[in-house]
């Protein structure tokens, strides 16, 4: 089977590499010539565990190719996945210009049946706009060529995307015809031979499912952060509370960890987009507005804890950040809590030293020389008055407290992810602060 994936960013590249791995012939398309040339050389523009090896393996096998020209591959593919970006407009709504550009290109050059599948996260009603854009181009050409549109939202977790795609807990597909359903079944069956967990539904429901899923997860995070902040005020321990409620099978244990807020390319954007979709349809998403407000407040919580610990002001202090990416196992700093924290520290007159196993280049791109970049976690702590854990990378979980005691000037440790044992850190001679206790 031959397919094209338009958009060779995070979603498109993972999708293309994983389909190629099960024997599908895949052409990944992107308008960025430099990106495509690097991909042809096996250079991956993002960090995702296992992705580089998967891309290179399938390139070598001849199942994965890259091009800047969608029109050049249309005649040899039957299914086109659109995985282009949908950046938020100023009002929070999703910008569909790239999605519709892909649709128009398909309509302009297609010569036989195509199934056009939207993989990007898009608002309800986008598939119909895609259908209309393709049909407009066909009408302008005076051609009557059959085609289908479908919705197949991704549910990949950065840092675990390959496993998520190869062994999904479910695949959501919105279709309008039996032919589209048959093609999507054929594509996904190899991933789900032992348990075919493809959930077919109408297209609007599939489009809504993606937004609803991410918004639900964001809600759990903000709820637990709210509970954590209350725990601090009443003398409770949020970790004990988490264990108590997580044991309830109706609730479960996932996404119940308190911290310094969520970030990334999905949750913030999708919550905003769903709020905007509701407004456009005369409805107010009261809960999601609160979720968003709690998260923005939580991104500043480490700064406020530090400001409280140093009652005589932060100016002139040196502060170390362990972790820059919005979560471990990625270099993604989009909407990361670290960015809010760094901005506030710099505004307060602090010197900021940073280290992250993967996001240093991304931080340099965003912040330039505003912060000091260290080569490792202990160099980052050199002469620091305080150390703040922002991203819970594995290498940060068992630090040598004795080394830190010799390296740091001060004794303040603020744990933004509740990784460390309170007694252990305090017995090592540090002033320890965390979230929710």
Q: Where are these predicted regions, by residue range?
A:
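Structural/interface elements that position substrates and couple domains in central-metabolism enzymes
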Residues: 1-437
